[in-house]
């Protein structure tokens, strides 16, 4: 039960940070994929906003991952961040 609450909080944290950065906050989605040792948070944003979330030389994405890492230490559970983009129709784009 506590793990679910932590996971929801982490998803909300990533979503709020991303929404503050992008032009299309409605398109921001965060999906959690639980694994044995860690949880992967998949952040999906509109194609036009991917650069804003990644940032110059990946600095923004690295900063988001650093925050996740710091919170992960407190929760004793590893969270990682994957940044995905959608095409104009809202489907995952082929990378």
Feature locations, PLM:
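Glycine-centered tight-turn and secondary-structure capping sites
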Residues: 54-58
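RNA-contacting regions in translation and RNA-metabolism proteins
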Residues: 1-50, 62-63, 67-95
């Amino acid at each position: 039960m506590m793990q679910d609450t932590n996971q929801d909080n982490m998803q909300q944290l990533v979503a709020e940070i991303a929404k503050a950065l992008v032009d299309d906050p409605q398109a921001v989605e965060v999906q959690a994929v639980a694994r044995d040792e860690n949880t992967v948070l998949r952040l999906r944003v509109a194609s036009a906003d991917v650069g804003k979330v990644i940032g110059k030389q990946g600095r923004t994405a690295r900063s988001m991952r650093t925050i996740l890492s710091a919170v992960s230490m407190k929760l004793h559970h590893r969270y990682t961040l994957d940044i995905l983009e959608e095409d104009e129709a809202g489907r995952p784009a082929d990378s």
